[in-house]
Amino acid sequence: MLTYPNINPIAFSLGPLKVHWYGLMYLIGFIGAWLLGYWRIKHYKLNWNNDQLSDLIFYSALGVILGGRVGYMLFYDIQEFIHHPWVLFKIWEGGMSFHGGLLGVVIAAWLFCRKYGKTFLEVGDFVAPLVPLGLAAGRLGNFINGELWGRVTDVPWGMIYPHVDDQPRHPSQLYEFGLEGVALFILIWCYASKPRQQGRVCALFLMGYAICRLIAESFRQPDSQLGFVAFGWLTMGQVLSIPMLLIGIWLWWAKR
């Protein structure tokens, strides 16, 4: 069995300012997305320029942070938000919802499309290959924070989280890093390397992420304040992923 390494969540301090690994992971994700987008524009000679790319990443970053935090409080911890609304601003403590962030990015993309006259699916297809890198970084942030641990297990790589209990658990953050980050990145990046019907790359991302999340969540301990939310075995993350899967299937079929 393995033991969680108990990593200090603070990467470094600048005087009174403490810089957390969790925040750095998001910064790495946004910078990585810009670099990948820049490479795709140059390599595939896409009809994008650097100003558009920078604006898209900026809009998306706001959508991810605002939507992710608000989504977490609404989907996962509504009672805490009602009684202590100021916790909404404690982003460094963790507590971000991918699905809330996705809704934030959808709104950001809509505003971006209005400004630059691009279609929503064009933007979706462009940004989809850039997202998994950020997801991978975010899951590493979860692991460093020692949050979102897995269910009790007897597999040889089970990990004991001393701050939780003395039982070995699935390192589910690392499963999600591998599925939603690495595997999804390879899938989307390779698929988007050739010209596709508009909307297809976006559809594949929606389906791919939903499937990866449905699988990974089956190893993850449900949030203590929620437990299983449907049929006695579905977590909130799985429930929120089902509409993604259905929309992805519909979009894939519509753009065949």
UniProtKB/Swiss-Prot annotation:
Task: Name the enzyme group at the top EC level.
Answer: transferase
Q: Which UniProt keywords apply?
A: Cell inner membrane, Cell membrane, Membrane, Transferase, Transmembrane, Transmembrane helix
Q: Molecular function terms in GO for this entry?
A: phosphatidylglycerol-prolipoprotein diacylglyceryl transferase activity
Gene Ontology terms describing biological process: lipoprotein biosynthetic process
Entry EC number(s): 2.5.1.145
- Where does it mainly reside? membrane
User: Where in the cell?
Assistant: Cell inner membrane
**Bilayer topology term:** Multi-pass membrane protein
Described by its record, this protein's role is as follows: Catalyzes the transfer of the diacylglyceryl group from phosphatidylglycerol to the sulfhydryl group of the N-terminal cysteine of a prolipoprotein, the first step in the formation of mature lipoproteins.
The family note in this entry says:
Belongs to the Lgt family.
The protein here is known as Phosphatidylglycerol--prolipoprotein diacylglyceryl transferase
Q: What is the native source organism of this protein?
A: Legionella pneumophila (strain Paris)
Gene that this polypeptide is encoded by: lgt
